Each structure stands twice: as structure tokens, then as C-alpha cells.
């Protein structure tokens, strides 16, 4: 496939992940995508025809992450960037809920928001070392401040910050590791099935736009296409070559507090 850059993206079937697929394709990358179900696969196939390498599966399953990387290499020959983007929200789950609900939700949220990132990076790492590639993770405004979710979600996103720092240090100089912290963004993010939130979508919550506007100094709720530019910067071998261990916030100033 020559010198064309190759990126692999998890959580690619909706929201920020889907917009990442669009943006990286527009930037000339070859793209492989991990999606959750056949419905998301069909959506990508309709928009991109056969231009993507698509894997359907559970991001929590290490074999699925290994399959994503194998199929990426089989089709495109190499891997330049792995984007760990899959995630779920906790719909402001309170510590005052029954322990069984908290415990099962915590496990599911951390399995997807944290452990799946480790799994995907582990699967991608041998190929990234060959190309001196990079990792970009999706953190959150909730990695830096409270108010963007319940305590389970906020704890999971704080964990991502630790991963970025530890892995950037461990993997330098061969592989760069960074993250983007979106906030104030309306997406179709769902919640843990263990709490009955798997059929819910953030974008369908009544008043969500107005709530975000009230929390954001810039005064509007972002769309996924508004927050993808930092990923392209961090993935770039030219513009991002001296960046590692860095988290770029793109949250309309939400982490600063209310205006």
C-alpha cells in the first residue's frame, strides 16, 4: 500500500468514532474500524462502500482486538496509529444506588473505558513498533473535572490519564502515546447494560443541549465533527512527531467551570 498512512479505530460505528473515520479518510488514511454490531457495519458500508476494513465485535474481547489488527495488516500491510475510542457513559449513576447495581456498572464501565484500551494497545503494539507509530486515546472533560458524569464514569476517565502518562514513558522512543479530552459534545453514547442503560443515548436525553450550553463558557453544545481535529494532529508523523504523554482538551472551556 506504499507510504499511505494506516489508522485503526475502535468505537467507530457512531459518535466521535464515526466522525474520526470520516476525517481520517478525508485526510488520505487507510482506515480499519471496530464496530459493535451489524447495524453499524451496514452504516459504514453504505457510506464508504468497501474502502474500510471493518470488524464487528466486542471491544472487551482481546481476540476481537487481535482480529482487528490482523485484518488491518492483511489488507493494508502496516499500522501507523491506533485510536482507542470505544466508551460508555454512566448516566450520572450515584454511589447511593444499591451496591449490586454500582458493582456491575463499575465493572462494565471499566472493562470498556479502560481495559479495552489496554487490550487494543497490546494487540496493536507489535505493529506500531515496526513503524514507530502512535496511540491516541479518547479521554474526556471528566478526566479533569467533575460534573460530566457519575463517579464510575469520572473514575474511568481519570484512569485514562494515568495510562497515557505511563505508556508514553514506557514506550518512548518507539511509540508515541497521547489522548484527546472531548467535552460538551452531544453523541449517541450509551450506558452500561448492567444498569439498564444500554438502549439509552445521550443525544436523546431531554434538555441535553441546554444543559451543556449552561456548563460551557463558549455557550454551545459541540457535535462530533467539532472535536476530531486534535486526533489528526496527534496521529500526524509531521505535526505530531514531538508530542507524547500529552492530553489535548477540546471542551468549549467546560473544565474551567461555569461562566
Swiss-Prot record:
Select a single GO molecular function from the record's annotations and give it: cis-1,2-dihydro-1,2-dihydroxynaphthalene dehydrogenase activity
Q: What is its EC number?
A: 1.3.1.29, 1.3.1.60
Annotated binding of substrate, by residue: 140
UniProt keywords (A-Z) are: Aromatic hydrocarbons catabolism, NAD, Oxidoreductase, Plasmid
Q: What else is known?
A: Encoded on an unnamed 75 kb plasmid.
Q: Which family does it belong to?
A: Belongs to the short-chain dehydrogenases/reductases (SDR) family.
What protein does this entry describe? 1,2-dihydroxy-1,2-dihydronaphthalene dehydrogenase
The source organism is: Pseudomonas sp. (strain C18)
Q: Which gene encodes it?
A: doxE
